[in-house]
Amino acid sequence: MRGDRGRGRGGRFGSRGGPGGGFRPFVPHIPFDFYLCEMAFPRVKPAPDETSFSEALLKRNQDLAPNSAEQASILSLVTKINNVIDNLIVAPGTFEVQIEEVRQVGSYKKGTMTTGHNVADLVVILKILPTLEAVAALGNKVVESLRAQDPSEVLTMLTNETGFEISSSDATVKILITTVPPNLRKLDPELHLDIKVLQSALAAIRHARWFEENASQSTVKVLIRLLKDLRIRFPGFEPLTPWILDLLGHYAVMNNPTRQPLALNVAYRRCLQILAAGLFLPGSVGITDPCESGNFRVHTVMTLEQQDMVCYTAQTLVRILSHGGFRKILGQEGDASYLASEISTWDGVIVTPSEKAYEKPPEKKEGEEEEENTEEPPQGEEEESMETQE
């Protein structure tokens, strides 16, 4: 596992080699995943009792889930805004910003929100070209309609590079603007929202639809919430985007020979194990984005240093988990971010953190020939996660 880390794998299309300097096709390898080949490793003793670990996971999820007040406030604001926009679609009157549809996306739609971050995402698809003036006009129209309905409620509206957001005292709804796909070819960078922003909003709709159809199993949602928390508390996991965490959670629970969901404690451990085995390293088959064409592997949005950092952080946490340190990893015993970089002891067992295996090569001087020895993200593929970073 560690032996392959940091080696150049020959770029996107393989490395130069062989007679005539042709290209070897890039063949990704499959990292070791115990749960895909469990039959090959029959148990010689009973499985350990993990009741306390399972209970700790459920308790942590309970602590992370939005409380009833947060849920009520975000539901109320989303419903009001949704209704106002629906009315503008059905009966725009003299309002010139024509709307195709509005869709709920992100963690609110997926049911993976966390407490303390009461933010929901809506995508509004315009029929017209998305000018900055149109976005501001729509934001003002929506907030004015809301104030007319309930003058006592204090609301603020702010425009931003992705659209606008409307906030009450205890909830925020981000409205992400995009346009119908044929309009993407007519954009003027001087007048309209950035095409990357528009494409990201369309991708968020695809992600929400895929999640609803494939990942609505409750164990998947709980695991994703726990992974989001892990990402926040361990800097080594920061490069993992919300969309990568969604796919990783679904993979860990559902991708096994029986096609039956694994138990939460098994799936949580499996996440760390497959990350430690190099699921998101260069040359790995990784996880293919189900919402993009061309077998796009989601981990290629990360730099090589980030891919390595995710791997060595997971390796350290797997060792701590195997020696009973789950409460520390789950954040139930104070700050644990130091565990990924400092030596720790668990029941007399010393765990030494894994070190990075990839060193970024020095900058090449002008005129030097570029070596094709790194695997780069495919050109033209944008980061597939536009949802609120949580």
UniProtKB/Swiss-Prot annotation:
Q: Which residues form the DZF domain?
A: 24-371
* Key word Ubl conjugation present: yes
Q: Where is this cross-link: Glycyl lysine isopeptide (Lys-Gly) (interchain with G-Cter in SUMO2)?
A: 186, 364
Organism lineage: Eukaryota, Metazoa, Chordata, Craniata, Vertebrata
List every position bearing Omega-N-methylarginine. 16, 24
| Asymmetric dimethylarginine PTM sites in chain numbering | 16
UniProt keywords (A-Z) are: Activator, Cytoplasm, DNA-binding, Isopeptide bond, Methylation, Nucleus, Phosphoprotein, Transcription, Transcription regulation, Ubl conjugation
The superkingdom listed in its UniProt entry is Eukaryota
The name under which this protein is listed is Interleukin enhancer-binding factor 2
User: Which stretches are tagged as biased composition: Gly residues?
Assistant: 11-20
| SMART domains listed in its UniProt record | DZF
Q: How does it assemble?
A: Forms heterodimers with ILF3. ILF2-ILF3 heterodimers may also bind to PRKDC/XRCC7: this may stabilize the interaction of PRKDC/XRCC7 and the heterodimeric complex of G22P1/KU70 and XRCC5/KU80. Forms a complex with ILF3, YLPM1, KHDRBS1, RBMX, NCOA5 and PPP1CA. Identified in a IGF2BP1-dependent mRNP granule complex containing untranslated mRNAs. Interacts with IGF2BP1. Interacts with CRBN; this interaction promotes ubiquitination and subsequent degradation of ILF2.
Q: How is it modified after translation?
A: Ubiquitinated at Lys-45 by CRBN with polyubiquitin chains by the CUL4-RING E3 ligase (CRL4-CRBN) and then degraded by the proteasome.
Q: Which Gene3D superfamilies match?
A: 1.10.1410.40, Beta Polymerase, domain 2
Subcellular localization, per the record? Nucleus, Nucleolus; Cytoplasm; Nucleus
Where are the Phosphoserine modifications? 52, 68
From the record heading this protein, give the residue positions of the covalent cross-link Glycyl lysine isopeptide (Lys-Gly) (interchain with G-Cter in ubiquitin). 45
Point out the gene that encodes the protein: Ilf2
Taken from the record, one Pfam family name reads DZF_C
Q: In which tissues is it expressed?
A: Expressed in brain, kidney and ovary; highly expressed in testis, particularly within pachytene cells.
Which cellular components does GO assign to this protein?
A: cytosol; nucleolus; nucleoplasm; nucleus; ribonucleoprotein complex
Q: Which GO terms describe its molecular function?
A: DNA binding; double-stranded RNA binding
> What is the species listed in this Swiss-Prot or TrEMBL entry?
Mus musculus
Q: Which residues carry this modification: Phosphothreonine?
A: 388
